[in-house]
Amino acid sequence: MAPDPVAAETAAQGPTPRYFTWDEVAQRSGCEERWLVIDRKVYNISEFTRRHPGGSRVISHYAGQDATDPFVAFHINKGLVKKYMNSLLIGELSPEQPSFEPTKNKELTDEFRELRATVERMGLMKANHVFFLLYLLHILLLDGAAWLTLWVFGTSFLPFLLCAVLLSAVQAQAGWLQHDFGHLSVFSTSKWNHLLHHFVIGHLKGAPASWWNHMHFQHHAKPNCFRKDPDINMHPFFFALGKILSVELGKQKKKYMPYNHQHKYFFLIGPPALLPLYFQWYIFYFVIQRKKWVDLAWMITFYVRFFLTYVPLLGLKAFLGLFFIVRFLESNWFVWVTQMNHIPMHIDHDRNMDWVSTQLQATCNVHKSAFNDWFSGHLNFQIEHHLFPTMPRHNYHKVAPLVQSLCAKHGIEYQSKPLLSAFADIIHSLKESGQLWLDAYLHQ
């Protein structure tokens, strides 16, 4: 039987703390009971998951596991957070128990924690506010230039097209900037990060911050882990992803789509369709279904501003055409950039590996250049971003050599490639996994 939470908490804080083994912790990973370990302390999060500020699922994905490194990675004020966690404390690991499970590489984990301490001493977790101010200003300038294009040159085809391209750049770049605020990587307090996150994602993009938090934090916690990373939820209903999952799907004789042709239909239902045909409508369902009225209010300000700005110039019909062309262009930009770092990498069920191995097997980089940095919002440094999600993006290139050294020492592949090669690898990986599915479907 599980220990009584009140009694266990009292025992944990008294002179004789309650001790647990990893087997006991691992058993508490289901819907009824959820425990996790941080710095050898055992916490009962069964009731807390619904109140977790980062979302119920992201913390639940570590139920029954050690969560020390993700805890450090995601929180910017760990001391304050730990005070709130005291009410969840039920004991600690027995002295003879290792600090984390045998599936995790101890030497690699210890050295990564030393690297993190070095990074903090170097000041690489501190943001340059001028960088982010200039980044916001460049987005606002592009936004203004889009409107001025129609106002000055009229609404004929070429000005209309240029306006659409500029607005798609605004949307893409605002997407990268909201990502910075969402990860708490700009300000030292959560309050200001959250406020600017609402402004950028809500007012400049028309999307809800709560939806982004709910989806994106899960992705970072368990990247490319089936049923834990929502970014690969298109498996199996639209695509067969990864070698392991594709073969598994084929052996089960499941066929929701002709996966052996997925590298072809990706161009139809992937980049052009994700935002205008799915996200555009789902975000409203999300905020209304979950009663996220603050998010909805921020979103409405975007649509009101966009409507009042462009309808007087274009009329309603052309305005709607402009809106969906922008969403179409933005969708292509967004999908190619976000998928190039993950789809070609290892995709599997959660194997409860250490933090570094979890992130490195699921991510790759794209070579640094001024264009690549701007075009991808510095997500060409995906490895560094995943290891240090609250690090300001302008410091990724500074920590990259240290990460490469750590990977080389432990025989971990650190992948970095040209931008076009990264795009091509998406198609190559889809073709390969589709063929693996077909072979397993027909012959195994």
From Swiss-Prot:
Q: Where is this motif: Histidine box-3?
A: 382-386
Q: Which UniProt keywords apply?
A: Acetylation, Electron transport, Endoplasmic reticulum, Fatty acid biosynthesis, Fatty acid metabolism, Lipid biosynthesis, Lipid metabolism, Membrane, Mitochondrion, Oxidoreductase, Transmembrane, Transmembrane helix, Transport
Topological domains annotated Cytoplasmic: 1-121, 171-267, 327-444
What pathway does the annotation place this protein in? Answer: Lipid metabolism; polyunsaturated fatty acid biosynthesis
Q: In the UniProt record, does the keyword S-adenosyl-L-methionine occur?
A: no
The short sequence motif called Histidine box-1 sits at 179-183
Q: EC number(s)?
A: 1.14.19.44
Give all residue intervals belonging to the Cytochrome b5 heme-binding domain: 17-94
Keyword Electron transport, does the record have it? yes
Q: Top EC class per UniProt?
A: oxidoreductase
Catalytic activity from the UniProt record: (8Z,11Z,14Z)-eicosatrienoyl-CoA + 2 Fe(II)-[cytochrome b5] + O2 + 2 H(+) = (5Z,8Z,11Z,14Z)-eicosatetraenoyl-CoA + 2 Fe(III)-[cytochrome b5] + 2 H2O; (8Z,11Z,14Z,17Z)-eicosatetraenoyl-CoA + 2 Fe(II)-[cytochrome b5] + O2 + 2 H(+) = (5Z,8Z,11Z,14Z,17Z)-eicosapentaenoyl-CoA + 2 Fe(III)-[cytochrome b5] + 2 H2O; (11E)-octadecenoyl-CoA + 2 Fe(II)-[cytochrome b5] + O2 + 2 H(+) = (5Z,11E)-octadecadienoyl-CoA + 2 Fe(III)-[cytochrome b5] + 2 H2O
Q: In which tissues is it expressed?
A: Widely expressed, with highest levels in liver, brain, adrenal gland and heart. Highly expressed in fetal liver and brain.
Where do the TM regions start and end?
122-142, 146-170, 268-288, 306-326
Q: Return the motif ranges for Histidine box-2.
A: 216-220
Q: Which molecular function terms from Gene Ontology are attached?
A: acyl-CoA (8-3)-desaturase activity; acyl-CoA 6-desaturase activity; C-5 sterol desaturase activity; omega-6 fatty acid desaturase activity; oxidoreductase activity; oxidoreductase activity, acting on paired donors, with oxidation of a pair of donors resulting in the reduction of molecular oxygen to two molecules of water
GO cellular component annotations of the record: endoplasmic reticulum membrane; intracellular membrane-bounded organelle; membrane; mitochondrion
N-acetylmethionine: modified positions: M1
Annotated InterPro entries: Cyt_B5-like_heme/steroid-bd (IPR001199), Cyt_B5-like_heme/steroid_sf (IPR036400), FA_desaturase_dom (IPR005804), Fatty_acid_desaturase (IPR012171)
GO BP annotations of the record are: alpha-linolenic acid metabolic process; cell-cell signaling; cellular response to starvation; icosanoid biosynthetic process; linoleic acid metabolic process; lipid metabolic process; long-chain fatty acid biosynthetic process; phospholipid biosynthetic process
What factors induce this protein? Answer: Strongly down-regulated upon differentiation in a neuroblastoma cell line (at protein level).
Where are the Lumenal topological domains? 143-145, 289-305
The family line of this record is:
Belongs to the fatty acid desaturase type 1 family.
PANTHER family from the entry?
ACYL-COA (8-3)-DESATURASE (PTHR19353:SF57), FATTY ACID DESATURASE 2 (PTHR19353)
Entry remark concerning the domains of this protein: The histidine box domains may contain the active site and/or be involved in metal ion binding.
Protein name per UniProt: Acyl-CoA (8-3)-desaturase
Origin organism is Homo sapiens
Lineage, opening ranks: Eukaryota, Metazoa, Chordata, Craniata, Vertebrata
- This chain is encoded by the gene named FADS1
